[in-house]
Each structure stands twice: as structure tokens, then as C-alpha cells.
Amino acid sequence: DTLRTPIVAVLGHVDHGKTSLLDKIRGSAVSEGEAGAITQHIGATDIPLSTISSMAGELVQPEDFDLPGLLFIDTPGHHSFSTLRARGGALADIAVLVVDVNDGFQPQTEEALDILRRTGTPFVVAANKIDTTPGWNPNEGEPIQPTYEAQSERAQSMLDENLYQIIGQLSDNGFSADLYWRVQDFQKNIGVVPVSAITGEGVPDLLTVLMGLSQRFMKEEMAIDVAGPGKGTVLEVKDERGFGATVDAVMYDGVIRTGDTVVVGGQGDPIVTEVRALLQPQPLAEIRTEKQFETVAEGGAAAGVKSAAPDLDDAMAGAPVRVVRDRTEAEVIEEVKAELAEIEVETEEDGVVVKADTLGSLEAMANALEEAEVPILRAEVGDIAPRDVAIAETANQDEHKAILGFNVDLLSNARDELEAADVKLFSDDVIYQLIEDYETFVEERKRAQQETVLDKIVRPARVRILPDHTFRQNDPAVVGVEVLSGTLQNNRNVGKFEGNEF
């Protein structure tokens, strides 16, 4: 058995600096091209121990570590993290929860904590944006303690106040926490590492804590059979010039080799194919943005690997990848089917149609819609086709005649169908925005319906008999009245109050 690289997931609320922190660590700028500054697709960055050591300086001595480095997964929010973890391949071994030191806990921070608790994933908190503390004097790339000591007393006390607020919020959520250098037992307490994704202050400490925790508590779990059949999770399916459809995957066990037969989760049945070529980025390159791949004979855990093979067009992001070795093809197909069965979205007899670009985002959408109490009629991976419009039109309630498309295109032949149909399309590449837009539409539609109903309601009239306007006493009485409220109509009974009696 050999020790593999621990897989690190980075979680946190929107705009708290997840991507910027990874950018600082890997020195690239992925976040510039991301929708709404939210990382919506999964990538992986392998950071070798030698690089960590040079970044962390005296804090990390390579000879103290057996683990080869850290593999960072760039999760699009915590939904994908939980999805990838739930698929049998405990994809993240350890997590970093990024919290803006000024904003403290936000709804998605609490949600991420729930997931970490539920999956039992060890984590550290990166208290980000310390450089925005009023009066802060930045020291590029420095460990936290020397840079903290170099600050004015005022800046120190303001930062302390924010840090202890985060520690208090962790406590409110049932986690005992403290600044990482004060933590005696990391199995009982969460370490909080103050960092700046902009100046790099505290980043050496964060890498040190991640390496230390992995080495100390996860060394046994990192032991893998290097020659065993590869196991991984699809991150993305992409067309590459010269190769056709390729699959980007994170391998977390065993090895995948050129010429291997693999089973990959697909839109219909699992896909059985043969690996024609394996491509890997150079170290310190990010699998989503790096164009310069090198061809390799094999890809061992843990690493992001791009596989070129026939028939991968229908492979689904988030699905399992399994190498067929030491077992029959049929056994591996059954294993992949069983994993995919765990993540089927529950649908109702009436509801909206949901389309998303990956299994992870489809499940994330389904979870978010369930929380918002929006029923789903059908949920599928892929672009919006005429069939989706036809299905949406069959919804019973008007508000459900809608398609919610996440990160997908409207096919040209579906555009005409949509214009002719009474179906509303919502499309966005940020999940929470998509659901917010749909909820606004439902509220506006309900308000319009209520107004229509109210307009049709005839309110009872309240009238006052005008003095000196009684023209006839009875059979029939003829009087002049002032209408005080409501609508006075023909052939309606009238009465009057005497005290409380009608």
C-alpha cells in the first residue's frame, strides 16, 4: 500500500472568497471567468509537498511528512461537495470552510456546516479577508503570528473581536473551536486560521494545518492499493480537439491506465468503453483552465485525470468511473447502476421541469427546490429540448408550467415550441438566483389572480338614507340614499342595525 494525496474540499458562503483563496494558493485566476463570482464547476489542483513547503517556509519541513501533497477540489458550493461525497467515493477527506471575517456566518455557511456534520468530514475554518480590518498593514504571504504582531493595537483588537464572533457562531452550531495555535486536540476542537486570499497572509498556516491534520489523523485512510482497479468520480464531460468527448475525473483509489476497460455512469445505461489516452495537467495547473496537457500512461489516486475514450458523449458529471480489472464487466456495471440509483431525484405528479448540466448540479437544484417547497415533475441532465416544453405544458397548475434551466442552452427547435406554448422559461448559471426568479414569478402570478378574483367580488353596500328624501313610506318604499361603501345592486335584500341587532 502507498499513501495517496488527501483530497481537500473548499466550502463557504457566496463571495466569502473560496475561489480567491484557491487562486492565491495556486497562483491562477479562475474566479475572473466565473458566473456571479461563484465557482459553479468542479476542478482539481494538485499541490505537491515541495510547493507547500516553499510556501509555508519554516512551518512545513518535508522530512516530517509521508503524504505527497494536497489535492484541492474546487466545489461549486457545498451541494456538489455533499453529492460527490454521498456517491460511495468519500471524495473529500478534509474540508476548508471559508468565512468572511467581517460578515461572519451566513445562510450557506450554516448549510455547509450541516453537511460537514452529517458526513463527518474533518474541517478547519479559514477566517478570510483579515486585510480588510481597518488600519491593517499587510505583509504579503507571511504566516499569521508575525503579521498579527506587526499590527497596531487597534487593528489587533478589531480582528480579535471578529474572530471570536466566528468562534462563538461555531459554538452556537455545536462545534468547539479556537484559533488553531491554541487548539490542543484537533479531534475535539475546530482550528480557526485567520487568512487573506488577497495578500496571502495566513495561507502558510492553512497549508500547514491541512498537512498536519491529514498526516496525523488520516494517514491510514490514505493507504491505497496502487495497482488496484481505479475508482473515481466524473467532474466534467468535455469535447477536446483531436480527442472528441473526454471525461475529467478525480481518481481516489487504485489506478487507471491507457487500454483499460472502464464503466462510466451515463444518461441511460452505464457506458462501457476503452481508454484510448490519458491526459494530465502539469503540477500546479488546474484541470479546468489548463490547456497544456501531457499524455500519461496511467493516472493513480489521488489526481485529476482526463480520459479520452469512445462513446463518452452521454457520460454524466458526478457519476462514478470504475476500471474493470480483477472482476467481471457485469459486476462493475451493477456497482455503477447501484450508485446512480442512490441519486435519482424524487418527482411529483405535478410540478416544474428542471434541466441542469451535471448530475451534481441537478441534485443541487433538486435539494434547493425541495427546501423552497417547489415540486418537480421531471428532472434531467442536458439542454432544453421540445419534449421538455411539451412536458411542462402538461402541468396542472399554471405556476408549474415552467422550465428551470441551470447552466444549459435552449435548443433552437425548442425555441419555437416555447413561444407557442404557455410555458415560462427560467435560465441562470447561479442556482439561488434561478430559484429566486421563479419564486418572484409565482408571487406575481398569485397576486394577479387574487386581484382578478377581488375585482369580481361584489361587496355588500352600506347606505345612508338622506334626510328629506323619503318619497314613499312603503309598498314599495322609495328613498334617496348615499352609498357609503360597496356596490348597490337591484333585487338585493336590505336591512338595518339597531344596536347589535340586524
Residue ranges, per PLM feature:
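Active-site phosphate-binding and catalytic loops of NTP-dependent enzymes
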Residues: 1, 29-36, 49-60, 81-83, ...
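Conserved catalytic network of the ASCE P-loop NTPase/AAA+ motor domain
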Residues: 2-3, 38-39, 61-66, 86-91, ...
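Conserved G1/Walker A P-loop phosphate-binding module
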Residues: 2-75, 94, 118, 134, ...
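Residue-level signature of catalytic and energy-coupling elements of molecular machines
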Residues: 14-15, 21, 38, 74, ...
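Conserved Switch II/interswitch segment of TRAFAC-class P-loop GTPases
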Residues: 47, 79-80, 90-110, 117-136, ...
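Switch II of P-loop NTPase G domains
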Residues: 54-115, 286-292, 328-344
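C-terminal effector/interaction modules appended to NTPase cores
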Residues: 66, 127, 143, 237-502
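Canonical P-loop GTPase G-domain recognition
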Residues: 131-224, 375-382, 388, 393, ...
